[in-house]
Amino acid sequence: MNYRNKKLLELARELPCQQCGREDGTVVAAHSNQQRDGKGTGIKAHDFRIASLCFTCHTDIDQGSTLTKDQRREMWEWAHRKTMGEFFLRDLISIR
C-alpha cells in the first residue's frame, strides 16, 4: 500500500514551480514515475515522492518528446530535492 497524505499534496501547491519558478496557479504535486517509488500500472508513487511543478514542466517531464528518459528523470529528481528542501526551509513540514 502506497503512502497517501492529502496535506502534503496541498503543500506542494504553495510553492513556485521547482523547475522554472513559475507561480501561475498551475503548480501541483507531480509524482515520481519510477517503480522504485511505488509507481505501478494505474498506481501513483508514494505521496512523499513528489515535486512542485507547473503544468508545462510537469507535462515536459511526464511526456516530453524533446527530452530523453534520463533527462526527464534527472529533472524530476532535481525538482523533488528542491521541493523537499523548500518544505523544511519554509517551515511547512517539521520533524516532531
Model regions: which residues?
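Short recognition patches in nucleic-acid-associated and regulatory proteins
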Residues: 25-41
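Polybasic, low-complexity binding patches
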Residues: 38-48, 59-96
